[in-house]
Curated annotation (Swiss-Prot):
This is Alanine racemase. The active site is at 34 (proton acceptor), 251 (proton acceptor). The gene is alr. The lineage of its organism: Bacteria, Pseudomonadati, Pseudomonadota, Gammaproteobacteria, Oceanospirillales. Belongs to the alanine racemase family. It comes from Alcanivorax borkumensis (strain ATCC 700651 / DSM 11573 / NCIMB 13689 / SK2). SMART domains: Ala_racemase_C (SM01005).
Amino acid sequence: MRGTRVEIRLAALRNNALRAAELAGDAQVFAMVKANGYGHGLLLAAETMLDSVSGLGVAVLDEARTLREHGIALPILVAEGFFDAEELEAAARLSLEVVVHSLWQVELLLANPCPVRIWLKVNAGMNRLGLRPNEALSAAARLSQAGNAPVGVMSHFACADMDEDIHSEKQLLLAGSVAEQLQLPLSASNSAALLRYPRAHAQRVRPGIMLYGSSPFNWQTAAELGLQVSHRFSARLIAINAVEAGESVGYGATWTASDPRQIGVVAVGYGDGYPRHAPSGTPVAVNGVVTTLVGRVSMDMITIDVTGLSASVGDEVELWGDVVDVDDVARACGTISYELFCQITQRPERTIV
């Protein structure tokens, strides 16, 4: 076998969900399992964390429908809400909670009354989705008069994961003010806010990336936050070549040896979901020893420096997991672990442990 493999660890998912619940205190924990459970598998992630959380969060109705069709009865929040009357009716039929983030959704609800649980989303400064505070208050009044009163207020922090965060306090005050005026529960905390701002926990938190063993911060590791690795990506060495000083490696000859080196060829590439934009110097580990990527990532292969290492064809190369922190790989690539998890393709073997 080629040996390119993704290992999903159920015990780590459970640990991380319990860690979120511990931090949340009395607040409900809605585990975000959108985007195929951040690349871990929608059903796998949901079923593994069922006993540790109060509900689940998805982005779109089809994800929620899949969960319901597989017997998951926990409350499910659909973060993008509904796109048309048909989806609105389906949300009611499936007993889903839907986010109302725009005035056109308010009008659609008023024109198509449905017994659906509504969370009004307040734009408290992120300027992506959400009603302005005055719009949210007006929408709540109109929906209540029509017999479909919202059950909660939610918002989303823009900068809770940043070292110098000057926005979250203001956002919390704005969203909290709307919730207080409407006398409704508030949900605003993502992973970063759950870990960092106890005041923001309110009545419901919506952790995502921390559940999958990754830190939302660049100054604290997942292990330091009490999280465990749930996603390990590995491959095998399929060749080792001697390269002389002045010789280049890979497409575009982007890396040139300054002295004689031993270059390992690894059976993984962007066709498997390894980031094509990973630069030379990105960490990998051979038999538990960290070394680096050299040259450009190909569709099916990468090349790494194994000079001085005890390395043979067939040996395992960890791309991220126990030795190589996924967040270090993400930083090297100028991206975030969320993208790395989500872009793994169907080609690597999946192992559930």
